[in-house]
Amino acid sequence: MDPIDIAAVADDFDREVAATPAIDRFCSSSAWILAAAAALMPPRAPFAFRGASGYFAAMRGVHPAGFPYIEPVELAWGLAAPLIGRDPAGLAADVAGVLAARRDWQLAILAGLTADGPQRRALDRALPPRWERRRGTPTLRHIASLDGGLDGFLARRSRELRKTLRKGLRAAADAGVTFESARASPREADALYERIQGVEARSWKAREGVGIVSGPMRAFYQLMLPRLCAHGQQRTLFARQGERDLGYILGAVFEGEYRGLQFSYDDEHARLGLGGLLQLHQVTALCEEGIARYDLGTEMDYKRRWAEEVMETEMLVLVR
């Protein structure tokens, strides 16, 4: 395998991501991992390689305790898979060879692996038995099928949720709330993000310091959005009352799947149930577009009401 700069080969890298089985594709793609590396991760050195069977997307760092380590480009949530390629057996053998030939690491973290997936099985066969193997905490994502369009999606939701959405639609209509899609070119990405931030600043998330109004999380999405716009991936909806934005929902599509990223609403209008209505209108638009699945992201209680499938990945930690 040869060293590479992922940013320089991002389009080819993403094509391989699209063909890689049993991974979180969007969160392994260049838009997600490069933004995370720049905004959320500590300083590290590149450790990415390309070979005949695919890519190894990783970085090398030194822990404060002094030991060197290898980890995926994104490890803020551990969603990104570092082994990218359609031939898991060949790729695992190549990656094992790279790791065995290098003496500049003591611990290697391989995240984003499904426990019974082809990458994990191939690694079990390819890695030297003398290396200690540990399993990290699993990461869960909630995923909803959009099969059957909006009617099919709603039929798989609870009666209580459907009732809440109908009530919210009536309240929003009475309040003069409308919903509109916002597409943007790369040059318009900053303006779109400022519009998103205008809503975010008036949300309960900003008040409690858990949103994206400041700090690394603000930078993360600010770096990601131009890449999404450049490839036509971003999907943003706004809830509006006259000329005022009351709420937004932001996500991205990749290979027939939508990944929800963020949504917020003006806290003064919480009674309208805008969070659920933004989700509903986004699902409606996605169904019309022919998107097959909606990945709501990592574990949160409310997501269980909106999804029926759980994707679980885990972390393999190697110590030598």
Positions of PLM-derived features:
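Acidic/polar loop patches that form or flank catalytic/metal-binding clefts of enzymes
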Residues: 207, 236, 292-296, 312-313
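Residue-level "edge-of-site" marker
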Residues: 185, 299, 316
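Acyl-donor binding region in acyl/amide transferases
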Residues: 62-137, 255-310
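Short alpha-helix boundary/capping motifs
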Residues: 41, 224, 307-315
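Non-catalytic surface loops within mature trypsin-like serine protease
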Residues: 86-87, 146-148, 320
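A conserved beta-strand-loop-helix scaffold within acyl/acetyltransferase catalytic domains
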Residues: 2-69, 112-141, 148-271
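Conserved catalytic-core motifs of GNAT/GCN5-like acyltransferases
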Residues: 134-143, 310-320
